[in-house]
Amino acid sequence: MEIYNTLTRRKENFQPREPGRVCMYVCGPTTYNYIHLGNARPLVFFDTVRRYLIHKGYEVLFVQNFTDVDDKIINRAQEEGDDPLALARRYIGEYFKDADALNVRRADRHPLVSEHIPDIIKMVDELVKKGAAYVVDGNVYFEVRKFAGYGKLSGRTLEDMQAGARVEVDPRKRDPLDFALWKAAKPGEPCWDSPWGPGRPGWHIECSAMSLKYLGTNFDIHGGGYDLIFPHHENEIAQSEAATGQPFVRYWMHNGFITVNEEKMSKSLGNFFLVRDILAKFPPELVRFFLLSTHYRSPLDFDGEKMAAAGRGLERIKTSLRLLYEALERPVSEGVQAVCSRDPFDEIRASFEAAMDDDFNTALAIGAVFDLAREANTAVQRTGPAVSGQDRQILQYALDLFNEFNEVLGIFKVDGASGRLLIDGAAGDDSGLVEGLINLILEVRQEARKRKDWSTADRIRDGLKELGILLEDTPQGVRWKKQG
């Protein structure tokens, strides 16, 4: 298995610190708001990484933090007249609601900054004693130029960073590049006692202290979004290696940005989507499927047409599963000649593994799922009202592969009673089938609009309205919702 390592800028053969065991840390959200689509991508992707490592037989210790002490939280709490820590806890609860909807499994540990202040103070104190950090008026700063390897993750030189430093430099710093490890207390902000007076930790030191506490030095995988490479992860390396004298992380993994209609997602452009708003319009399995449909290091563009295309693809997989479930209920007759072969399914399984072994290429892995759907459909069509014992075993193998691939990709939730994949919503719920039919109808309407056949397009819209389905034509594509 190979992983692209941001630190070395190449794919490397994966060799964990301990054979058979993987320790991984992923930077979690700063909990001052509901999570947005950009937060959801690393959330879903690194959940998939963890799932695949377990599938490969590794024991995985997965840690994902919550930053519940931060300037953004303090500012938001002041706006709302709330306590910063209480506000952060509330949004942590909302985070789990969105994560659960996207079928993201809980980490083994979810450390909070506010519960690890002694660990953070201890690490800052160690850096001060080693001469890597200095104290000014109750603030503690890391002295960047004393760490020889600074810039090795981002590929930036000190000269480049110096040129890009802001004009307004904190006069308390010895160098504009130095960053805060501990911030002196300000009125109205949460603070804790420390050897340098009351204050709170800086952002970067939090992740270092918590990851080192639970995973130790030179742990296996540290993940996060591409935007965290600099300064956050660069600073994590500097302070961690200065404190311990040991390599911090073996493999650094970073996912690409999400764009909306090929523009960067931002509040100012009005294209900033919260996960829960998206989940109000699209089923969670489709959102997860879409997020995994592109290689994690590539940008992922979100728009209505791409979601509709992903929806059509997902419906093909659902249809194949429905056919398999139905075929496996047919009677077995030994008088029926076997017509199916296991070989194509073995090849598909190998191609899925090869895709995931190649830097967790979920896009190619999903391609293998489509191959499985096509081959399963062919096998079902070849069999009759009764199937041979051999063919039934092959059909069951096809279903087992769907389950195996889903255990890695996590697209569908699993019914605890039957073990079936929940492809149509909750057990006994046909909402998924209804949604698929509506999307097919909308596809026909879209084709009519392209032909400028407005009469047909309007007739479809009016017919759906009579059934309680309202359509909204937007620049991102057509959206629908149930009336009332």
From Swiss-Prot:
Keyword Cytoplasm: yes
EC number: 6.1.1.16
GO biological process: cysteinyl-tRNA aminoacylation
Places the protein is found: Cytoplasm
Segments carrying motif 'KMSKS' region: 264-268
Manner of cofactor binding, per the entry note: Binds 1 zinc ion per subunit.
Keywords for the protein's UniProt record, in alphabetical order: Aminoacyl-tRNA synthetase, ATP-binding, Cytoplasm, Ligase, Metal-binding, Nucleotide-binding, Protein biosynthesis, Zinc
Binding site for ATP: 267
Cofactor field: Zn(2+)
Entry's family note: Belongs to the class-I aminoacyl-tRNA synthetase family.
Protein's name according to its UniProt entry: Cysteine--tRNA ligase
Organism of origin: Pelotomaculum thermopropionicum (strain DSM 13744 / JCM 10971 / SI)
Gene name of this polypeptide: cysS
